[in-house]
């Protein structure tokens, strides 16, 4: 993790003046601290460094150089509507949000942010329909509950290292994107609406309930994280999701449509091969059951 004393990277010498984008992990960042990033002989200029990636969504970065070490000091980005506490609805008198430190109301179409911070309630109760343009989650352990629903073409982004549990039913249709190291726990079979989910890096999508037929289309084909089934969840997937790792909890079931799989599949659940031919080239370590389905007169091989 970053600190203010020791540079994250030390090199023998540094030269050049090309524009350089600095990307920082979000999990341990705080405002008002000068983080030591890079140290090396010849480092005297900070003007060509800029803040990029997920951190740039939330912070302004001021770079400086002292004694051959590059530092960045972060401040909250202005104009972001950040969750504070209370109930999420569209009432103009409901100031459950903060805009540059001022209690504020939410209106449909806005981009909203769920970040860690003093006085932030991680339990988000949704009342009625809400339709933000985009939801950015950078904090950890947020939980959405209530009788309300996220609707419209909303996109849901879990930035690197963020975590969110969705226990309410939603109908939003925009993409759901999980950044590296983030985790989305689905506690309601209708939580994802009609959204397509993209897993990036070491992100985790955990389905704890429901029957998820068609995972091969609900997940973006470029996904690379882990799909975890827990509770009483079950699902059917296809070989198209070549980069996804599957983790099956006890009492869960994953059915593989016919195809050739190079995926890692582990856990204590049940793995089923549907009618047709399945070839498993990946690491498969299941302590539950293996089942092969067959139809009279139809070939089925494992």
Regions found by a protein language model. Give the residues of each.
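Extracellular beta-strand/loop-rich repeat segments of large surface/secreted proteins
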Residues: 1-36, 86-90, 194, 203, ...
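Solvent-exposed adhesion/ligand-recognition segments of exported proteins
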Residues: 25-153, 163-165, 169-171, 185-188, ...
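Short, T/G/N/S-enriched strand-turn elements that build extracellular solenoid repeat scaffolds
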Residues: 7-16, 97, 101-104, 112, ...
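Residue-level signal for tight coil/turn positions that link beta-strands
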Residues: 18, 67, 139, 160, ...
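Secondary-structure transition/turn motif
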Residues: 72-79, 170, 209-210, 230-234, ...
């Amino acid at each position: 993790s970053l600190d203010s004393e020791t540079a994250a990277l030390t090199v023998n010498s540094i030269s050049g003046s090309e524009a350089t984008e600095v990307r920082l992990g979000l999990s341990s960042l705080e405002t008002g601290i000068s983080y030591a990033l890079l140290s090396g002989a010849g480092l005297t200029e900070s003007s060509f460094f800029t803040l990029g990636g997920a951190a740039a969504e939330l912070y302004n970065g001021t770079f400086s150089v002292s004694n051959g070490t590059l530092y960045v000091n972060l401040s909250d980005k202005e104009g972001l509507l950040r969750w504070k506490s209370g109930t999420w609805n569209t009432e103009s008198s409901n100031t459950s949000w903060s805009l540059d430190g001022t209690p504020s109301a939410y209106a449909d179409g806005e981009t909203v942010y769920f970040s860690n911070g003093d006085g932030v309630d991680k339990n988000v109760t949704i009342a009625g329909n809400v339709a933000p343009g985009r939801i950015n989650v950078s904090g950890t352990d947020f939980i959405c509950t209530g009788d309300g629903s996220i609707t419209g073409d909303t996109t849901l982004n879990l930035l690197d290292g963020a975590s969110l549990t969705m226990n309410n039913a939603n109908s939003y249709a925009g993409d759901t994107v999980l950044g590296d190291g983030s985790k989305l726990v689905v506690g309601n079979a209708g939580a994802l609406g009609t959204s397509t989910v993209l897993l990036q890096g070491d992100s985790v999508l955990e389905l704890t309930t429901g029957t998820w037929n068609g995972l091969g289309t609900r997940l973006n084909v470029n996904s690379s994280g882990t799909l975890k089934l827990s509770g009483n969840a079950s699902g059917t997937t296809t070989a198209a999701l070549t980069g996804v790792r599957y983790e099956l909890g006890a009492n869960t079931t994953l059915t593989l449509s016919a195809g050739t799989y190079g995926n890692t599949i582990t856990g204590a659940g049940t793995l089923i091969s549907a009618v047709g031919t399945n070839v498993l080239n990946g690491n498969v370590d299941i302590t539950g059951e293996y089942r092969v389905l067959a139809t009279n007169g139809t070939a089925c091989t494992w």
